Every structure is written in structure tokens, then in C-alpha cells.
Amino acid sequence: MSVPDIAGIAAIVVSHDSEETLDDCLQRLRNADGVAEIRVIDNDSSDASLEIVQRHAVADPRLRFIANPDNPGFAVACNQGAADSSVPWLAFVNPDCLVEVDTLARLREHAEQEAPALVGADLVDEDGVRDVAARRHDPDFAAMLRSPAAARLGVEIDTTASLQHVDAVSGALMLLPRWLFERVGGFDVGYRLHAEDLDLCRRVRDVGARVAVANEVRVVHVRGVSSRSRPVFVEWHKHRGLWRYFGKFEAPRRSGFVRAAVFAMIWVRFPFAALRALLRTQR
């Protein structure tokens, strides 16, 4: 379906050792309504990811790619893809997200109706189990010190609402107007991996825009394709990202004691989380 550039969507995919799902992801994006540009930023893949991307680029002039010689992180690569595109809408799509033909166009419709807005989808795994990261509230680290239950950021789906307002959606799939992305300065490149989506959603809300999930737009998210080979690396940057998020948004209003306690809570948890992640990959 041909869509004029005034409504065009740039689909931005960051790949790293993503060959397992990348071919399917890109083919679906090429078939998707509203997609005017596809930008793939490859962060130093050692598998067949680049060969897959090159094959799609030859077949479809809408697709261009940047092959980074190292891995500067997800946020940096997303910003690279946004800067290399020009149409009014930006969709950040993980290589393990498998969109349907109408997915991005429907998200754009919701974002237009709620303007300005950043919109995510109802993410499920291959068995139909919902991803709790699709609907989240902001972390409250002081509350986590009082109760471990506060660490659970997931928000239940509101089955009565086609569009559910939340604090944050998953960076695995999010769509927003380019002008809004540029107004907040894009992704914070101080994050290497994880929590950059929480950060972006918070800054979007801080400028008066909305963050929401289109509950009736379901997308399969095959989680963890790129991270299975390096579980300890992923956990390290996940915890580092949480500490950065706390430092930006919560630490300035907390006492020195609370800041020290949060630091200890995050980094004491890291070795246990890393061990669990490592054991999961060996099953």
C-alpha cells in the first residue's frame, strides 16, 4: 500500500547477532503499511545478520543500513537510524519483533488521535504470554528499599480500553512523531543497554506528551535473541542503566543515606541476577 511521505514511517532496527529473527522482521517491515524508510543499524554482529540486511537492501531501495565497527549500544544506534531517515514518523522495532501488515499504521493512527503521543503495542511471546514490559510505571527506588514488590514495574492491561495510558512502554516497539523525538533529544546515549526506554518515555511525558499502549494491536516479541550469548554483559548494563536512571530522576530529591542504600541494592543484586541469567542460557 503506497503512503505519501507526509504520513511516512521510518522503521529503525538495531541488530546485534540477530540472524535468528532478523530476516522475518525485515520482510514483515517491507510488507507493512505506511513504511516509507527502513534503517538497520548493525552493532558489530558476528553472525549472518549483515548478510541478511544486505540481501534486503538490494531488493528494496527503502532499506539502508549502517554497519558499526563496534557496539556503541542501543541508544546510540537508534539515534543513528533516526538521523539517517527523514519522514515524519519514527518506529523503533527490535529485530525480534514480528509486526503484522497493519501494525505500524494502526499505531500511527492512535498516536495521531492522542497527539502528541508515543505509542507501544500489546507484546506477547510465541505462546501468547504478555510481556510485562509493554506496560510499566516509573521506577521508585526508595519504595523498593521498603518493599521488594515495588521492583515489579508491570501494569495490568485494561481490557476495557483500546488505548491505555501508562508511564512507559517497551523499547522493543515504540512509535512517535519525529518532532517529538527531536524535541526531547532522542535516546540518552549514556545508557548502553536497558532502561533507555524508561528514560525516553519519562522525558516525553515531561514535555506534556502522552505515553500509551494500543491494547488491540498485538505483536509477537521473541525475547532475548541478541542477548542469549552474553547474559552477564546484558545484566551488567541493565543494572548500570537502573543506576543512571535513578541518578537522573530520583537521586536529586533523596538523602545521601537513601542514595547509598539504592546503590547497594542495585549492585548487590547484580551477581545473583547475572548467575540466574547465565544458568537460563545453559538449560
Spans of features found by a protein language model:
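Short, acidic, metal-binding catalytic loop of nucleotide-sugar glycosyltransferases
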Residues: Q27-A36
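Short, flexible, basic/aromatic active-site loop/helix in glycosyltransferases
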Residues: D138-D167, G171
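Active-site-adjacent helix/loop segment of glycosyltransferases
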Residues: R202-T281
